[in-house]
Amino acid sequence: MDNTEKNSYVKNQITNALLRLLKEKELKDISISEITTTAQVSRISFYRNYNDKDTIIKEYIHLTLNEWNKNHPKTEEHTEDDILGDIFAYIIEYKDFYLLLRDRGIFYFLKDIIMDALGPKSEYPNFDAYTTAFIANGIYGWIEEWFLRGMQE
């Protein structure tokens, strides 16, 4: 195994360990030592790859998004309705993960991703920034309510 493969293996082990531990307890109650013990890697390996536990979750979300996008290529006539449909289809595909985030009170990680992707940018004029923030927060609220109602539609 070369260094890239080893690093990928370690990150995978750490991510899987954190996800297993999240099934048992809150994120705030999980220590780095528990993660590394469960992952069977050293603390040095943890800190070589991550700053904190939040980074693991954010990176996992980006990984799943990239994987989903790779498997669901966009067409040129991709409309706003298509984008919304894609968001919900992605969440359904990774439903267990997002239910785990919701159950552990850390669903806000999804909001961070939505705001990064669809929210206002610093170069936007004020009105455009306000409108974009309104829409992005509305989409997050819609998804959150959809989860609360059992993801029925």
Give the predicted meaning of each segment.
Residues 59, 108, 130, 152-153:
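Short, solvent-exposed positions on alpha-helices
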Residues 8-19, 23, 28-32, 37-40, ...:
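An amphipathic alpha-helix adjacent to DNA-recognition modules
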Residues 8, 22-26, 38, 120-122, ...:
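Cytosolic nucleotide-binding catalytic cores of signal-transduction proteins
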Residues 3, 76-80, 103, 124-128, ...:
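Residue-level recognition of alpha-helical structural elements
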Residues 1-7:
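N-terminal intrinsically disordered/low-complexity leader segments
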Residues 85-86, 102-140:
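Amphipathic alpha-helical packing segments from all-alpha helical-bundle domains
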Residues 97:
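Basic K/R-rich, polyanion-interacting modules in nucleoproteins and related proteins
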